[in-house]
Design a protein with these regions (language model features):
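N-terminal alpha-helical targeting/anchoring segments
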Residues: 1-134, 149, 153
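TRNA-recognition modules of translation machinery and tRNA-sensing kinases, especially anticodon-binding
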Residues: 27, 130-427
Length: 427
């Protein structure tokens, strides 16, 4: 959410930013917000004037009563009753206006960074850099679920009978490989990157949902617990950032660098939907995430550090990757800048998304009231960032395809062998 003062002083910049994101249907919101904000401030001023007048009259009544002029005091008390009635109406109007302004402000997208390429959707994202040499073996690579089925590592039919499409049973060495990747990611982030490991709540309240994402994202992603003010998280970023809700942080304690493990639950109601037989887009998966809460001047430096952590992690497992700068139309409303990390698929002979890093500047912090007290005592909003270290279902696809041997076995990179009981290959 933007600063109202910024919108008030820079309406043209806000409108131009909306156009850059190809959301012209939101342009009327800016003028509506400005009009309602003006009316709100006028209402507040009128109410303040009435309160001041009420205070003045109250003193006058006290003075008259002290002088024994009860009749005169009673006459003036009628003015107090009229003021109280008018003040109640103004306060009700103020509440409605404030709610309306907030609702509209939450629909206006964050200001994107000047470096973000302009484009309508992910087809116009821009490649930044490649790491590792993509290899296509001279033998045919089966679909990832077929590789796992040959190794007795997955049962999609049983999962479909139990829960429907978008779920799976992982078994044996594949299940162990899944856990090994997560455990290695945890230790990589703790031991090599110095992040604090946290296991967060897997459900959050609606007030946190409103703070971490837009309503449109929430509708397409999150499962609500019936009869409760609780939602299953779509990523641990939600509960990790929510940890700082309604807090004032000490500047000397920044940055907070957390890495978290959690299961994730998603409706996947968007254009892509879920796969009938596959683990790329599913309803339930696990993930190792990282978040940073920092000073505004440090957020862009942390932004590159975060996505390079993911690049480094994948390269330790010998998986070629590339980074893509997300264009303006591909950015969610709260994001200022975002980079996707994609892994090489030898079967498809192309890269596919395995993680995303985002700098949300102060958009989430304003919604969640995450402030920082500086050394001079002044308070300002923190910047928040998030990044995927690894989501094993997608990582499994990249891992299996890039480490598959012609005989159907899977090589285990040295970094993972301690987490696989010393095994150097499976199958």
């Amino acid at each position: 959410m933007l600063d109202m003062k910024f919108v008030r002083e820079n309406p043209d910049i806000v409108k131009e930013n909306i156009k850059k994101k190809f959301q012209d249907y939101k342009l009327p919101l800016v003028n509506e917000v400005l009009m309602e904000d003006k009316e709100l401030r006028q209402t507040q001023q009128h109410a303040d004037d009435l309160r001041a007048n009420r205070k003045k009259i109250s003193k006058e009544i006290g003075k008259l009563m002290g002088q024994g002029k009860k009749e005169e005091a009673e006459d003036i008390k009628q003015q107090m009753a009229e003021i109280a009635h008018e003040l109640t109406a103004l306060e009700e109007k103020e509440i409605k206006l404030r709610e309306s302004v907030t609702e509209k402000m939450m629909q206006i997208p964050n200001i994107i960074d000047d470096s973000v390429p302009i484009g309508k959707d992910d087809s116009e994202n821009v490649e930044l850099e490649r790491f590792g040499e993509p290899v296509v073996p001279d033998f045919e690579i089966p679909y990832h679920t077929e590789i796992m089925e040959r190794l007795s590592g997955i049962d999609l039919d049983a999962a479909r009978r139990v829960a429907g499409n978008g779920f799976y049973y992982l078994m044996g060495d594949i299940a162990r490989l899944h856990s090994a990747i997560l455990n290695y990611a945890r230790d990589f982030m703790i031991d090599k990157k110095g992040f604090t490991f946290v296991i967060p709540p897997y459900m959050i309240r609606s007030s946190v949902v409103d703070g971490v994402m837009s309503f449109a994202e929430m509708e397409g992603m999150m499962y609500k617990i019936e009869g409760e003010d609780l939602y299953l998280i779509g990523t641990s970023e939600h509960s990790m950032i929510g940890k700082f809700k309604d807090t004032i942080l000490e500047e000397k304690d920044l940055p907070y660098t957390y890495t978290s493990y959690s299961p994730c639950f998603r409706k996947e109601k968007g254009a892509h939907g879920i796969e009938e037989r596959g683990v790329y887009r599913i309803h339930q998966f696990e993930k190792q995430e990282m978040i940073v809460v920092c000073k505004p001047e440090d957020s862009m430096e942390w932004f590159k550090k975060l996505y390079m952590n993911t690049v480094e992690f994948f390269r330790t497992l010998d998986i070629p990757v590339r980074t893509l700068e997300c264009c303006s139309g591909d950015l969610a409303d709260l994001k200022c800048k975002s980079v996707d990390v994609e892994a090489w698929s030898p079967r498809q002979k192309k890269y596919f998304e395995v993680g995303s890093c985002s700098n949300l500047t102060d958009a989430q912090a304003r919604r969640l009231k995450i402030r920082v007290k500086g050394e001079n005592g002044e308070k300002y909003y923190a910047h928040t960032l998030n990044n995927t270290c690894v989501a094993p279902p997608r990582m499994l696809i990249a891992f299996l395809e890039n480490n598959l041997q012609e005989d159907g076995s899977i090589l285990i990179p040295e970094a993972l062998q301690p987490y696989m009981g010393g095994k150097k290959k499976i199958g």
